[in-house]
Design a protein with these regions (language model features):
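Transmembrane helix-loop-helix hairpins at the membrane interface
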Residues: 1-111
Length: 111
């Protein structure tokens, strides 16, 4: 069981942030501005895509309100930094912190 937990934590902290940010903020944020998303600069701002990506991101997570706040932070980082590095690091830090909390407090409901 400890090995399974270790793999879960590694996945949550390293794999999930990269994959989710590539989808939500690299692809979908641009796609909602222009379906030919490759023509949209990373971090380009439009209210509709900003709000839509945050809401859809939150709907995909267990804790909607908390995910709204996380989505606002991650999306704002992409827009201000014009890149994914900051939001991937923030997302990884969030997931690592949550994972360590879940393990140390045995609060498996958060996973």
């Amino acid at each position: 069981v400890p090995l399974v937990i270790a793999f879960r934590l590694i996945g949550a902290a390293l794999v999930v942030p990269v994959m989710e940010e590539l989808f939500w903020r690299s692809f979908l944020l641009g796609y909602l501005i222009n379906p030919d998303f490759k023509k949209v600069a990373l971090g380009e701002f439009a209210w509709f895509s900003f709000v839509a990506v945050i809401v859809m991101f939150a709907l995909e997570h267990h804790r909607f309100i908390q995910a709204i706040f996380a989505g606002i932070i991650y999306t704002t980082l992409v827009i201000h930094q014009k890149g994914l590095r900051g939001c991937i690091i923030a997302h990884a830090t969030t997931n690592l912190g949550l994972g360590l909390y879940v393990i140390s407090h045995q609060e498996w409901i958060f996973w």
